[in-house]
């Protein structure tokens, strides 16, 4: 296993204890999951009138461009404004793709990049999209290849290497805006991605870059490698049916719980895209998106209006409701790997994309969540610890003029009205989750 260069700072903290300001955030692996935990059942919705009123006051004249849903651990819908209206979620889409990957692959899963020898003696390089694969890893692959011939004292023959990579048509979701593809956040999604296919901006041709650097490193070491491009297996199952191969060298990524943090805490688009593809076993983004939708359905979530177009949220064709996201958060809180999921998120006032938000307020250290931002879209969803237990909160705005202000006000309202002051048991309402 290679030494990873990720610096992700995962911390699993009891939800009742906020993180102290300025405290170090070391890597702590959550304990093994309990077994046979029950799936959540969304109970008939019960509204908290005081919270519902506060939400509408907070939103004011902007209510029509917002969707807000607040659930408690019983599945009661304590507050809901346009919660069933599908909206563009931006990076809140990562909450879906990371939940899917964690459920399907488990917290110890690692992405692998391998140099393989086929039964006929030929060599091939394949990968799974490790976002941390770097130049040092490439150098180790070159050394391993040269040991098979083409290096000083080994053989005068040039090493023939098949590099299996996705066709260019699969490098970007087709609906990603061309302007985004030039930036690091819009880098192409490939199986063999040195430095996540970004050097300042996006690398426009990652295969050509890999070929150039591999051959140059071999030449620097006195050897020669000739690279030929090959198609990867269509799916994981196809790869498993291939003839037995010998692993000559392998580089592995950080474990899943660290990859989740890279996607959710730091909002790394490349990682989220890779996780969705690996979870589905399909590197065609359209097929992987359909598999993600099926998984959401299998969780028993309210998915009316759901449309998955990518794994990161950069696509403007994604659609999801705040009710779906809040229900997913509740579902994952009951999941055997819930600790890993929550530990992957940013913390208000402390870490990740929330490090500079709500610092020194009642929300500091008490809200773990995921933010989302693309032009005209702001979203924030996550777990808010209150005196009455956790609240699963999702907010999505498409066209808000002052989203940051309203998101903070809404979170404070949820904190203030937990427990609901009007009654111990909130009144029933008709638009219940089913």
Model-assigned labels for residue ranges:
Residues 75, 89-107, 192, 213-214, ...:
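Active-site SXXK
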Residues 22-86, 107-108, 144-155:
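Beta-lactamase-like hydrolase cores
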Residues 113-220, 252-291:
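Active-site-adjacent helix/loop patches that line small-molecule binding or acyl-intermediate pockets
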Residues 1-4:
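Positively charged n-region of N-terminal signal peptides that target proteins for export
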Residues 103-120, 226-232, 338-342:
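Short, well-structured active-site flanking segments
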Residues 78-80, 276-434:
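Small-residue-rich helix-loop
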Residues 155, 198-340, 344:
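A small/polar active-site loop signature that marks catalytic segments
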Residues 13-20:
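C-terminal segment of classical bacterial N-terminal signal peptides
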């Amino acid at each position: 296993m290679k030494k990873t260069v990720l610096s992700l700072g995962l911390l699993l903290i009891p939800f009742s204890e906020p993180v102290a300001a300025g405290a170090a955030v070391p890597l702590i692996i959550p304990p093994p999951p309990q077994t046979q935990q029950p799936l959540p059942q969304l109970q008939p919705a019960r509204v908290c009138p005081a919270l519902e009123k506060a939400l509408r006051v907070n939103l004011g004249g902007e209510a029509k461009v917002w969707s807000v849903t607040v659930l408690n651990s019983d599945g009661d819908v304590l507050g809901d404004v346009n919660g069933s209206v599908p909206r563009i979620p931006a990076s809140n889409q990562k909450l879906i793709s990371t939940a899917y990957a964690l459920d399907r692959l488990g917290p110890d899963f690692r992405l692998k990049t391998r140099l393989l020898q086929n039964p006929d003696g030929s060599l091939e390089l394949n990968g799974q999209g490790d976002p941390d694969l770097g130049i040092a890893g490439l150098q180790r692959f070159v050394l391993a290849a040269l040991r098979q011939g083409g290096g000083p004292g080994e053989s005068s023959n040039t090493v023939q290497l098949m590099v299996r990579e996705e066709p260019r048509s699969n490098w970007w979701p087709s609906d990603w805006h061309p302007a985004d593809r030039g930036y690091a956040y819009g880098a192409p999604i490939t199986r063999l991605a040195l430095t996540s296919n970004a050097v300042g901006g996006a690398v426009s041709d990652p295969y050509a870059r890999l070929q150039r650097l591999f051959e140059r490193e071999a030449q620097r070491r006195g050897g020669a490698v000739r690279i030929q491009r090959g198609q990867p297996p269509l799916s994981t199952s196809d790869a498993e049916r291939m003839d037995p191969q010998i692993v000559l060298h392998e580089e592995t990524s950080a474990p899943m719980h660290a990859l989740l943090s890279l996607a959710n805490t730091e909002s790394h688009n490349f990682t989220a895209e890779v996780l969705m593809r690996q979870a589905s076993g399909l590197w065609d983004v359209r097929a992987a998106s359909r598999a993600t939708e099926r998984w959401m359905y299998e969780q028993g979530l309210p998915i009316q209006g759901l449309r998955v177009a990518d794994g990161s949220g950069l696509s403007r064709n994604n659609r999801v409701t705040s009710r779906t996201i809040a229900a997913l958060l509740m579902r994952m809180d009951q999941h055997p790997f819930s600790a890993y999921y929550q530990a992957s998120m940013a913390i208000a006032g402390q870490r990740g994309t929330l490090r500079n938000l709500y610092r020194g307020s009642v929300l500091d250290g008490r809200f773990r969540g995921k933010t989302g931002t693309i032009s005209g879209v702001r979203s924030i969803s996550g777990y808010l610890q209150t005196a009455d237990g956790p609240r699963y909160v999702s907010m999505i705005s498409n066209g808000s003029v002052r989203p940051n202000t309203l998101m903070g006000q809404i979170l404070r309202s949820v904190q203030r009205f937990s427990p609901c002051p009007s009654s111990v048991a909130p009144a029933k309402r008709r638009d219940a989750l089913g």
